[in-house]
A protein has these predicted regions:
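Conserved HGGG/HGGXW glycine-rich cap/lid loop of the alpha/beta-hydrolase fold
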Residues: 10, 15-59
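Alpha/beta-hydrolase fold catalytic core
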Residues: 1-23, 44-47, 86, 110, ...
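Catalytic histidine-centered segment of alpha/beta-hydrolase-like enzymes
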Residues: 222-231
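Conserved alpha/beta-hydrolase catalytic His-Asp/Glu region
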Residues: 123-186
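Active-site loop/oxyanion-hole signature of alpha/beta-hydrolase fold enzymes
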Residues: 51-89, 236
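Conserved alpha/beta-hydrolase "acid-adjacent" motif
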Residues: 197-203
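Short beta-strand/loop motif that positions the catalytic acidic residue
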Residues: 184, 190-192, 196
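Flexible "cap/lid" loop of the alpha/beta hydrolase fold
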Residues: 98-140
């Protein structure tokens, strides 16, 4: 059953079910509880599952100010404290993985699982979109189209968001969490799709080097949602890891 709790004057939706040791599941940007429930449903026999809609997503209220990823982590910390969740296994997909990294860097956790979680900001290696824009600039008389191209090639996440959520998205993607990742001192499992364009496998390999006790599993022919595309296999992996 979905429950609403007020944290920092924001009504936040969450569900908690199952029994056993605690597992916390954190969804990605633009997603909600439903995106992590397939994992929770298959782990609930041996674990107490907690999943929330982050502020601004699902049925949780939108924040009135532009939060940072650290603000989101503080909200998670308050929620888990109220729910008496201690030393959980924390799992996050994409944006949720960013929050999991911060949480695990400064709280007691049993283990960490990250699914396609970009957390290392790179100045070099511009994205395909930026490369395309730069190539456009080389064509005479094309400069006027740059704004048009940026608008039409911009992130769907960004274009669909409210003004507050747009500012939050900018805050999130500009944050480099390398230093937080280095502080994670528990076994950490990275599960990635080899065709992930949002968080390329190269990023996962770097993350594996940064986190002291990390292991990487790359799933073939899989995208940013590799954990859902290979659910039976991922559940087997998780059961062995936990």
């Amino acid at each position: 059953m979905v429950v609403t709790i007020n944290i920092r004057n924001i009504n936040i939706n969450y569900i908690q079910y199952g029994s056993g040791s605690d597992v916390v599941l954190l969804h990605g940007w633009g997603q909600n509880i439903a995106m992590m429930k397939p994992i929770g449903d298959r782990l609930q026999k041996n674990h107490r599952i907690t999943i929330l809609d982050f502020p601004g997503f699902g049925k949780s209220e939108e924040p009135k100010t532009a939060l940072t990823v650290y603000d989101y982590c503080e909200i998670l910390e308050e929620l888990l404290k109220k729910l008496k969740v201690k030393k959980p296994v924390i799992m996050g997909h994409s944006f949720g993985g960013r929050i999991a990294i911060i949480y695990a860097s400064r709280n007691e956790v049993e283990k960490v699982v990250l699914f396609g979680s970009p957390c290392i900001r790179k100045e070099v290696k511009p994205s395909l979109k930026l490369r395309m824009l730069k190539s456009l600039k080389k064509i005479p008389g094309i400069n006027k189209l740059e704004g048009f191209a940026k608008n039409h090639m911009g992130s769907r996440d960004y274009k669909n968001a409210s003004e507050v959520m747009k500012k939050i998205l900018v805050n999130v993607v500009n944050e480099d969490l390398s230093e937080c990742a280095k502080k994670i001192n528990v076994p950490t499992l990275l599960i990635w799709g080899d065709r992930d364009t949002e968080a390329p496998v190269e990023d996962a390999k770097e993350l594996e080097k940064i986190i002291p006790d990390a292991g990487l599993i790359v799933l073939p022919n899989s995208t940013h949602y590799a954990y859902l595309e290979n659910l039976p296999q991922v559940i087997n992996i998780l059961n062995n890891f936990l």
